[in-house]
A protein has these predicted regions:
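Helix-termination/interfacial motifs at the ends of transmembrane alpha-helices
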Residues: 98-181
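Large intracellular
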Residues: 1-109, 184-243
Length: 243
């Protein structure tokens, strides 16, 4: 009964709070956490620098064929916009609008688990209150029923425990991990935006690389530095597997 009150109440409140089309994607959220795409900006930086060197040497048009080989649709779109000689401000605007829409979508995903995390303890407390009321109704001190007071109290309070478990061991960590994954994707795409605009502007590849690396977290910056000291890191798989 305690578990049903907490789970049933929490999920009912979530269903009442969000559109059904968003709730249907909760399974995809779990897939994203467990086996979703890993956004690693280090390899894409190497690809951007390679493209910058090609563009400075042979012109932007030479990148069209290479862009069509890219597996990342966002990166591909950015390079093709540059090849089409679109203004730098327009290129940035288009790509940043796409990132803004993505962030809004991600915030909606995280909000589901934030709400569930806040609802679970509340329904745990409701379950406890219901249990206490029932316990008080059944008390009859004249017949010695006070002996079972401890057991009844424990049963009532365990509902609060279940609510805290759901909030702090399930919904809270899911929300946190989704935020981390979402932040990784945002940084990855910000690197692509700055790289694409830098390629179009004809920035010096070394200067451009420093700029892109500065966007990363310190651990990623150190990884790139260690890769350079060790003779260079892996490059992104830029082309699809040849038949």
């Amino acid at each position: 009964g305690s578990v049903l009150i907490v789970l049933g109440g929490t999920f009912s409140a979530v269903i009442a709070s969000f559109p059904l089309d968003k709730l249907k994607k909760m399974g995809k959220h779990m897939t994203k956490l467990i086996s979703g795409k890993k956004y690693q900006p280090e390899p894409v930086i190497e690809t951007i620098i390679e493209f910058a060197q090609l563009a400075r040497k042979d012109g932007l048009l030479v990148l069209e064929e290479r862009a069509n080989e890219l597996e990342d649709p966002f990166f591909k779109k950015g390079i093709l916009l540059v090849v089409d000689a679109m203004e730098a401000e327009k290129v940035r605007e288009i790509l940043e609008n796409e990132v803004s829409s993505m962030i809004e979508r991600h915030d909606g995903e995280v909000a589901i688990y934030d709400k569930a995390s806040s609802y679970a303890p509340a329904f745990g407390m409701i379950g406890t209150l219901v249990g206490l009321v029932n316990m008080l109704k059944q008390m009859n001190l004249s017949e010695g029923s006070s002996d079972s007071l401890g057991t009844s109290m424990a049963t009532a309070l365990v509902t609060t425990f279940y609510g805290c478990i759901l909030a702090n061991l399930i919904f809270g960590p899911i929300s946190k991990k989704l935020r981390i994954r979402n932040d990784e994707e945002v940084i990855y795409k910000q690197v692509i935006i700055e790289g694409v605009v830098g390629i179009q502007a004809g920035d010096n590849p070394k200067v451009l690389k420093e700029k892109l690396v500065s966007l990363l977290h310190q651990t990623s910056q150190q990884k790139i530095l260690n890769g350079e000291e060790g003779g260079g890191g892996k490059k992104e798989k830029k082309s699809k597997k040849e038949k």
